[in-house]
Amino acid sequence: MNKFLIIDGLNLVRRIYAAIPDETDMQSLTERVSSACTKLLRVHRPSHVAIVWDGDEISWRKQLYPDYKKGRKPMPEPLAQGLVALQDHLTAMHIGSIYAAAEADDVIATLAIKTAKAQGEAIIVSTDKGFSQLNHRHISQWDHFNQQYLDIAALEQKLGVERSQFLDLMALAGDSGNKIPGIAGIGPKSAAELLKTFRSLPTLFSSLSNLGAKQAKKLAEGKEMARLSYKLAQLQTDLPLNINLKDFRVIDSQPEKTINQD
């Protein structure tokens, strides 16, 4: 069975970069990222590995909702200037890069789902909790900085909802980190309580008469914003990748076919 290690490039690199005392020291960054990748390969022993990078195009989410990720700090200039050299160094280490047109998240999600559907195992290396929506027994998420897999049970307890309700929670309460709006006046706690009672968005919105007038009014007025927020939070898993697995092979394995759109 193929085991594909899928690294969220900027999630890893920017966290490492933030810990470097001298932000212009690209040599130190390269050494630390190389060491991290070497450790990832040693710990997980994958058959395939790829590091996925964000692109420069405006994402479809930003086009749909211009305030999406508004206020995010731009990439520090030294890192922006040194990124290509770092990527070349990783290529020399036989860690192939995949370049997304815009956001890496959708490419990572697509690659993970396609790997799992092909009876392989996908390990996503990222601290981004958004990947927890990929509810498949052959997909796991590894936090390199804490050296542990994402604890879904702990996340469910923290959020107050089941994994299958993650997107419904984002639709109602939004996500301040990504500037996903949710419904005005509905916070994470009240959203979790609503989902505990009604289980899903369709059931909730068809049961507004069972709620108090004030809360029902908020939900009714915010229904379209909830739909928008759901769409913004949902990862795309059906992008055309057109990659050949042999380009990302770490160890000897059987010849692989091209991963394409189903």
From Swiss-Prot:
One annotated GO biological process: DNA replication, Okazaki fragment processing
Residues annotated for Mg(2+) binding in this entry: D105
Binding annotation for K(+): L172, A173, P181, I183, I186
Pfam families: 5_3_exonuc (PF01367), 5_3_exonuc_N (PF02739)
5'-3' exonuclease domain residues: 162-259
Cofactor(s) listed in the protein's UniProt record: Mg(2+); K(+)
Annotated segments matching region Interaction with DNA: 185-190
Keyword Metal-binding assigned: yes
HAMAP family: Xni
Function: Has flap endonuclease activity. During DNA replication, flap endonucleases cleave the 5'-overhanging flap structure that is generated by displacement synthesis when DNA polymerase encounters the 5'-end of a downstream Okazaki fragment.
Protein name as annotated: Flap endonuclease Xni
Gene: xni
